[in-house]
Amino acid sequence: MSEEVKNSVETEENKASKDNATQAPNPTENHNTAQETEKAENSEKTESATQENESLDKLKKDVTNYREQLLRTVADFENLKKQKEREVASVRKFADESLIKELLPVLDDIERVLVNASKFLQASPEAQSYVDGVKLIQQNMMKVFEARGLKRIEAVGTPFDVHLHEALSQMEKEGAEPDTVIQEFAPGYTLNDKVVRHSKVIVSK
């Protein structure tokens, strides 16, 4: 009977020893598991960093593209603004051209009156105030015209210029160089450097 008990006790001890051996942690397995976990974490970190870098690169490219588009838009706007300013300036520059052309014959009449004023004054000295009034009108008209860019073309004594003068005839004149304006019948004018009326002249042969 004691022999059976002894065997039973040994059997239980062996079983417990096996169970303990099975349950005891393996240091090698634990080390491998820790390495795998660390590798997985590092891999995730690397992947995350790569994604962040890619996102940052894309953002930089987008910013560069937007900046270039903005600069092009600003440049286009500035060009359009300058073009419109030039157009407005051009319109303003020649807006009065048609009106001035219509008033030039009136100015011619005033000048003819003043040229013949001496005859009027000889016959009627009291007409001096009338002549002075006409002179004042002429001066005021010229101030208005000149403020808008009107200038009288030089004629008598200058070389004939087909762009500025209209030759009514030619004649010989002693001491005058050929193709020189020797007489002016009607003055010519430029408006902001554009000829609005040629001078009507006689040219020397």
UniProtKB/Swiss-Prot annotation:
Family: Belongs to the GrpE family.
Official protein name in the record: Protein GrpE
Region of interest (Disordered), residue spans: 1-60
Pfam families: GrpE (PF01025)
Biological role: Participates actively in the response to hyperosmotic and heat shock by preventing the aggregation of stress-denatured proteins, in association with DnaK and GrpE. It is the nucleotide exchange factor for DnaK and may function as a thermosensor. Unfolded proteins bind initially to DnaJ; upon interaction with the DnaJ-bound protein, DnaK hydrolyzes its bound ATP, resulting in the formation of a stable complex. GrpE releases ADP from DnaK; ATP binding to DnaK triggers the release of the substrate protein, thus completing the reaction cycle.
Compositionally biased residues, Basic and acidic residues: 1-18, 36-47
Gene, per the UniProt record: grpE
GO cellular component terms, semicolon-separated: cytoplasm
